[in-house]
Amino acid sequence: MLELGTTGGAAGDLIKDTSEATFMADVIDASNEVPVIVDFWAPWCGPCKTLGPALEKAVTEARGAVKMVKVNVDENQMIAQQLRIQSIPTVYAFFRGQPVDGFQGAIAGSEIKAFVDRVAAQGGGAPGGGLDEAVTAAE
């Protein structure tokens, strides 16, 4: 089955759906390695249908500098309540287990790219949060 909005095998590693059972591993734990952008959405939400694919495209273009996790708020109400999601779409970015940035509502494509670039920069702007470059520099 082809997932809407993903391209190629690499996107599967960068973009995934999560649930209440896997949120901690998919977002909090994963954000210790690289920033994780979390898209809170619902199937009936018109703006979500526009924002989601645009966000997926920007994350894929970041080539591993960030990951994206999607939360269907209808299926994962506990997560939405705990993070006080009042309207959708809502997007949060997590790094080192903490929310570091975010926005509500649909935004323009240029703003989405700027957001992803800003979040990627917090993690070093490279896959692994710049760890490879730091190790190379230390050697």
What feature does the model see in each segment?
Residues 82-86:
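A short glycine-leucine-enriched loop at secondary-structure breakpoints
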Residues 1-63, 77-78, 88-90, 95-139:
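Proteins that catalyze or organize thiol-disulfide redox chemistry
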